[in-house]
C-alpha cells in the first residue's frame, strides 16, 4: 500500500516567498510613480479645477495618436485642457511633444493645427517632433528646449508616471489629467492595465539605465523666445 505523499513544506515556503518577491518587484515601479507624484497632480473636472493648478512656464502636451490629420479623442481632450490652461493664464506656452518618426505620421503638427483652429496663436506653440515616449518628452523638454517648470497634460491613468518621469528629468512638474473613463471606459481600462509594464520600463529608463532620448539634441531656443515675449 502506497503511503500518502506529504507536501514539501520547505519547497512550498520558497515558492510562496518567490511569489511575494515577484509581486513586490512588479508593484514597486507603480508605487514609485504614485508616491512621487502625490501632491503634484489634479484632475480637469469640476467647476474649480483650474484653481487647483499652479502657474508654470509651459503645458507639456504628450502625443496620444493621430488619424491622418486628426487627433485621437484622447489627444483632443489633452489639447482642450491645454487650451483652458493657456486661456486662464496658467501657462504661457504650449510644448507639443509627439512622434514624427515617419513622414506620413506627424503628431506635433496635427496637435498644432487642432489648437490653431481653437484660436491658440502660433506664437504660443512650440513643437517637439521627437517625443517618442514619455521619458523622451520629459528629458527633451529640459535639455533641448530649456524648460524648468511645466504642467504635463495627459489622461488620469498616465498622470503618475508622466509627472514622476518629468520630475526625475529635473523639471518642476505639476500634472493635469483627463478622466477618460467617463467617455471611453473600455479603452481607458485597457491602457490602465498596460501602465504596469509601461511604468516598469519607465523606472528602468529613469532610475536604472539613465537612458538618453532617441534624439538628445541639439538645443533649441523656440521655447525661450516664447517665454521672453510679454504676456498677451
Predicted regions and their residues:
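A structural signal for short, hydrophobic/glycine-enriched beta-strand patches
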Residues: 2, 6, 33-193
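A transmembrane-helix-recognition feature enriched in membrane-embedded lipid enzymes
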Residues: 189-212
Amino acid at each position: 500500500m502506497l503511503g500518502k505523499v506529504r507536501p514539501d513544506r520547505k519547497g512550498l515556503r520558497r515558492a510562496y516567498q518567490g511569489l511575494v518577491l515577484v509581486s513586490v518587484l512588479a508593484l514597486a515601479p507603480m508605487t514609485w510613480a504614485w508616491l512621487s507624484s502625490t501632491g503634484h497632480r489634479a484632475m480637469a473636472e469640476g467647476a474649480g479645477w483650474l484653481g487647483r493648478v499652479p502657474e508654470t512656464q509651459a503645458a507639456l502636451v504628450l502625443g496620444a495618436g493621430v488619424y491622418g490629420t486628426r487627433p485621437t479623442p484622447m489627444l483632443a481632450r489633452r489639447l482642450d485642457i491645454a487650451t483652458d490652461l493657456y486661456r486662464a493664464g496658467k501657462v504661457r506656452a504650449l510644448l507639443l511633444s509627439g512622434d514624427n518618426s515617419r513622414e506620413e505620421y506627424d503628431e506635433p503638427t496635427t496637435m498644432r493645427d487642432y489648437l490653431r483652429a481653437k484660436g491658440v496663436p502660433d506664437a504660443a506653440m512650440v513643437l517637439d517632433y521627437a517625443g517618442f515616449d514619455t521619458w523622451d518628452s520629459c528629458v527633451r523638454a529640459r535639455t533641448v528646449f530649456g524648460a524648468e517648470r511645466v504642467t504635463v497634460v495627459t489622461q488620469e491613468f498616465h498622470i503618475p508616471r508622466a509627472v514622476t518621469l518629468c520630475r526625475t528629468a529635473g523639471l518642476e512638474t505639476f500634472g493635469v489629467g483627463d478622466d477618460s473613463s467617463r467617455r471611453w471606459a473600455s479603452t481607458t481600462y485597457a491602457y490602465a492595465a498596460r501602465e504596469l509594464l509601461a511604468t516598469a520600463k519607465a523606472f528602468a529608463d529613469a532610475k536604472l539605465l539613465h537612458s538618453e532620448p532617441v534624439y538628445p539634441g541639439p538645443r533649441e531656443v523656440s521655447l525661450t523666445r516664447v517665454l521672453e515675449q510679454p504676456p498677451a
